[in-house]
Amino acid sequence: MTEVKTERPRPAAAAGGAQRRPFFRRRKTCPFSGEGAPKIDYKDIKLLSRFISERGKIVPSRITAVSAKKQRELAQAIKRARFLGLLPYVVK
């Protein structure tokens, strides 16, 4: 059997054309650290609801950019608020 190799055309940037600038992703900072940052409180439903998905799940820190320590505090506050009936467990 004879193997036939086909060469795909390369994009203009890889072929020696104009070089693309690499995409610069801005580093997110924790919304709970720094001056004037809100305190995590289980009674602050307006704040806690920003970190809950539309299905009622806790949004992960890689999306919200919350630090690991504050994410644990946030999860504990959300669970406390759910237990007291201030937040729903699931949204239908």
UniProtKB/Swiss-Prot annotation:
Membrane-spanning intervals of the chain: none
GO cellular component: cytosolic small ribosomal subunit
Gene Ontology biological process terms from the UniProt entry: translation
Basic and acidic residues bias locations: 1-10
Disordered: region residues: 1-28
Gene3D superfamilies: Ribosomal protein S18
Gene Ontology molecular function terms on file: small ribosomal subunit rRNA binding; structural constituent of ribosome
PROSITE patterns membership: RIBOSOMAL_S18
Highest taxon above the source species: Bacteria
Low complexity composition-biased segments: 11-21
Key words of the record: Ribonucleoprotein, Ribosomal protein, RNA-binding, rRNA-binding
Pfam families, per database record: Ribosomal_S18 (PF01084)
Family listed: Belongs to the bacterial ribosomal protein bS18 family.
PANTHER family named in the record: 30S RIBOSOMAL PROTEIN S18, SMALL RIBOSOMAL SUBUNIT PROTEIN BS18M
The protein's role, per its UniProt record: Binds as a heterodimer with protein bS6 to the central domain of the 16S rRNA, where it helps stabilize the platform of the 30S subunit.
Complex formation: Part of the 30S ribosomal subunit. Forms a tight heterodimer with protein bS6.
Name of the protein described by the UniProt record: Small ribosomal subunit protein bS18
Organism: Paramagnetospirillum magneticum (strain ATCC 700264 / AMB-1)
